[in-house]
Amino acid sequence: MRPERGYVLCDPCLGRLFGSGNILHCEKRGRIIRGKGRDRPSECHICKGLCPSLEESCGPSLWGAAAYEFETFVVGVRLKSSMAERDDEVRSRCRLAGAAALRAYVAAMLSSYLGAMTGASVDHGAPELSITADLRDNTAEFHPRPVVLSGRYTKSVRGLSQKGAPCGGCAGEGCTSCGMLGVDTGGSVEGVISGHACGTYSARRASFTWVGGEDQESLVGGRGRPFVAQLVQPHRRGLVHPATVRLGGVVLHGLREVRSMPQLPVRFRSKVRLAVSAKGEISDDTLGRLADLGGSTLAVYEGRRRVERAIHSASHSRTGPGSFELHMEVDGGVPFKRFVSGETVFPNLSDLLGTVCSCGGFDFEEITVERGGHPGARGGTRRRPRKGPARPAGGRDRPRKT
């Protein structure tokens, strides 16, 4: 029995079902199986003429890849259910369990086409661009892998909170007033960094992992506070950033792309300066008790949960009869205002000095991530990502970036 008896098959489907070898050579194998002197059918029982004209009919749907920069990609395929059912029927009836499926052939051919146009390679593990080609209406969906940025920031102005409030116009969904970011871009460190990073990478929005936090009125000095930002739907990647990026009162340091988000929790230490006021005057002897803080351990209570935080060093300087500055290096996660007032932190300044104390503010002089706990793994040297296939002259405009 000839392989195609009972079915009219095109060369690609014939070679795919009844040949073996590289899936990209199915059409050539189909011509060999069919034999010389035999005319090619005008229509195929399975694909209805799709496979012989795959590049012409489906290739244009991949032009949207031109809006992205990438070195690796993967193509998935959606077929008409009737087409997939006919393919399954033929493979079952002819007992071709090991033959390549139509979906796999189409994905391989489109991948070959896109790879030839861009020089990018297929990666089924963690591609920089995932494409779903929908052959039901010859469209395509593009899903770039998020870009993860690691860096530090210093803050030289007060009145700027760390985390941004959702945009009042869209409740965090994204609108024109917030640049589609979902947060107020000017009222917080998060908003300032989001605006810069998403603008640089043409990304949809950013989500952050912070190494500690500070009050709205706190300053952040030294080398800055580490952070990691994941950029969603980026159109660019593989960028090299300046050593410092000045964004008003916020300065970014050492911004770079890394492989992944950090393993939580991240262990770190903070050098902090606290402004403390007591209810009355404090004698020098009483202030001398602060020397006992260095090398001690704080017990911090959060509901029924007890957490210990070490104080590695402590020193003080008087600023008035009933006020002083306390300089400490402590483990991350100490609630400084509660440490001063005495609420659920033991020992605390109010108990230690025997008077009611309040914290007028605190600034960070340095934040150090403990060895092996840096947020994000450094990425290797990489080539500049290629863009998608160039759109032919006179083609449709690029999709608008959002």
Swiss-Prot record:
Gene3D superfamilies listed in its UniProt record: 3.30.70.2510
Pfam families: Pus10_C, Pus10_THUMP_arc
Annotated function: Responsible for synthesis of pseudouridine from uracil-54 and uracil-55 in the psi GC loop of transfer RNAs.
Active-site feature positions: 215 (nucleophile)
UniProt keyword RNA-binding, yes or no: yes
Family: Belongs to the pseudouridine synthase Pus10 family.
Record's keyword terms, sorted: Isomerase, RNA-binding, tRNA processing
Organism listed in the record: Cenarchaeum symbiosum (strain A)
Region (Disordered) residue spans: 370-402
Biased composition annotated in UniProt, kind: Basic residues: 380-389
Catalytic activity of the protein: uridine(54) in tRNA = pseudouridine(54) in tRNA; uridine(55) in tRNA = pseudouridine(55) in tRNA
Domain of life: Archaea
Gene Ontology MF, one: tRNA binding
Biological process according to GO: tRNA pseudouridine synthesis
InterPro entries from the UniProt entry: Pus10, Pus10-like, Pus10-like_C, Pus10_THUMP_arc
HAMAP family in the cross-refs: Pus10_arch (MF_01893)
Name under which the protein is recorded: tRNA pseudouridine synthase Pus10
EC number, UniProt record: 5.4.99.25
